[in-house]
Curated annotation (Swiss-Prot):
InterPro entries: bL21-like, bL21-like_sf, Ribosomal_bL21, Ribosomal_bL21_CS
PROSITE patterns: RIBOSOMAL_L21
Organism: Natranaerobius thermophilus (strain ATCC BAA-1301 / DSM 18059 / JW/NM-WN-LF)
General function of this protein: This protein binds to 23S rRNA in the presence of protein L20.
One MF annotation (Gene Ontology) recorded for this entry: rRNA binding
Gene Ontology annotations of biological process type: translation
Domain of life of the native organism: Bacteria
Assembly notes: Part of the 50S ribosomal subunit. Contacts protein L20.
Keywords annotated in UniProt: Ribonucleoprotein, Ribosomal protein, RNA-binding, rRNA-binding
HAMAP family: Ribosomal_bL21
Protein name (record): Large ribosomal subunit protein bL21
Amino acid sequence: MYAVIETGGKQYKVSEGDVLEIEKLSQETEEQVTFDKVLLVKDDENVKVGTPVLEEAQVEGTVLEHGKGEKVTVFKYKPKKNYRRKQGHRQPFSKVKIDKIKLNG
């Protein structure tokens, strides 16, 4: 059984037991998190597709840790004008383990 969920403006295909890195969540480490924006659920014989979301489906998970991604360096310059700006960015993320996919109905 797998589901497609939306969180942080992105869509993820998840199964029970998966560990994924998603955009940072406000929950603390070891807290439960529930994803209500479930777009699709497929089990052994049935496929349910939402329009756009399935109201009767939920995906539950546990926040394992928070962290920062790889550093991205942004460098801007104007030739011949001695204008240079170097800036770095590390995107925060949350690592979540999918515990259960619930489909009521």
